[in-house]
């Protein structure tokens, strides 16, 4: 394969082999837990249809052939060889693909995009200059809003199915592992033991989420490794002991014989066979925690061979046993020697818990990403580890998943219905990944549309075959993921659509800068001590909630900052590039604008560190702004404009959380002075010990203003002094409290979606103050009525 295939044509950075080995070992417990336990239920789900296990072995060999080639074509070739290369700055998953497409084609529906976002280190596009920048597909996507909405809906469908998989995978994994008790208990005991034990394990699993997995996470990789070795050894034993000729079933001809003999029943049984791919998407979704080479190494050298040996061993045993009691069905444990059945049962339960933990964590992660892109209602995100980035816990989602998992276990009570439901969720996510990867091949890798079409048709046809086999089982369990997806889709679309309309309403009703500057003592307006942080989604202008605030209370803070916390279509924003700071009006007005940018995988800061970094960024901006004007005035001669700073109101400067880091201005740099040197100028204006690279974050930022310095302008000293005094006086957070209603004459559907649906979600989900981590004692809410 072309070594430059993917990755935006950039060469892949090589890692030390020891690091790769360590990451490959650690990935076993995070990435491959779900995939490694699939042999527990694949054969059992497949033969749950009207397929007889005849003495000719055509059925079992046909199923084994399907399993082998499915594992080879989808996880090995599609994911490991191709999809893993479509990473977004090392991150994978559905939103990573969508983010790549949004950056290479103007199809993002995020409302407050800026040209400055394209200068982010993680945003920049890399492709050969000889590649044409325009393509017909790109032009179609950018021209038609309907196609952009369809693309977002497809991403939402994939997200909903991942969340649905978070409900179904723990249930089927733990239930299949515990069902091994059926070989050691009587029928009555089995019926009354397996379900309660499964429910107890699920409750225990979800109850532990609050404490995080970092304390026991070191056990995950050894458990999965032990399970893979155990499965391989049992597979080799069964092959050698029962049928060494089972390898002949790897011939794809057995797939054709299987379908010829079983006809419609064989096609429907594909819904059980596809479960062998369960967990393949995790290789891509968890790419950011490891590396491409580590995941590739672990799968090709250990996971893939172990799975093949496990499935071949089961087939070898079943090929010599055709008169199995229907009570036992054709499960995994029937092929395990009785002398080691109990240890294998315990190890399988542990492995199923590890696999379930991985999918639960993945569900939390994708909901957090959806929330960042305004596609999911606000929820409380708790970070369970200070050292491990991205390890999060969402309380309301956790308990909802637990209730649904237990309901699925108690309601279905068998592997067949759980497998049908889980299979449809899994294959739908894979179809979405195939469609998005095809677009990435054309738009991001700038490959031929023919190559993208070949990729789409080849893998898409395989997945559509499995999808049809799963969908036909709608009444036998497949209805559940569809129902969950429809509910989640309605929630996500209503929230996203209304959020966009609210932004458009704010944009249309914002007030002018002249109105803000006209607020003065003559109108009875009072400037009170302190810093006022006015939160808004707007990146320019004065929001309507502030005008409503001063209309009802004719006073605002001496230092006023309009804060816009926004998400950009990149996984991470470097701390040195997070803040965009500029003035609103002349310097004497003491009003600023600060745009805080986060990636869809970034962690929002707690209020103490955020407040400290924000004030620090303002101080650094004041220095750089003064230096800019000093150099500009020197370059333009003796002529000096009194309103020069007013002219730069629309100019925003990148201010990092560490002044020693690189700072950039989005205006042309014609002053010839390094911004790093400016941030470190020896005039003694600002001293910010809290931002030192190696120092811990403190809750206060102090400024030392040396008025005696001859290089310091008097106005800069006064401005910094006022900022220092305002910081000591305290900070108030001013947020809008929205009330949404529809316009008179709106359609019934709009009234239900916006007036009922959105308002219900808004009242019952977390408020913006919780998401922004605003302290209640410093919160001021301004009522805003949105007529949409």
Swiss-Prot record:
Belongs to the HAK/KUP transporter (TC 2.A.72.3) family. The gene is HAK9. Residues 43-59, 173-191, 237-264, 314-343, 413-422, 473-476 are extracellular. Signal peptide: none annotated. This is Probable potassium transporter 9. Keywords: Glycoprotein, Ion transport, Membrane, Potassium, Potassium transport, Transmembrane, Transmembrane helix, Transport. It is a multi-pass membrane protein. The chain crosses the membrane at residues 22-42, 60-80, 152-172, 192-212, 216-236, 265-285, 293-313, 344-364, 392-412, 423-443, 452-472, 477-497. Residues 1-21, 81-151, 213-215, 286-292, 365-391, 444-451, 498-788 are cytoplasmic. The lineage of its organism: Eukaryota, Viridiplantae, Streptophyta, Embryophyta, Tracheophyta. High-affinity potassium transporter. It comes from Oryza sativa subsp. japonica. Glycans are attached at residues 325, 420.
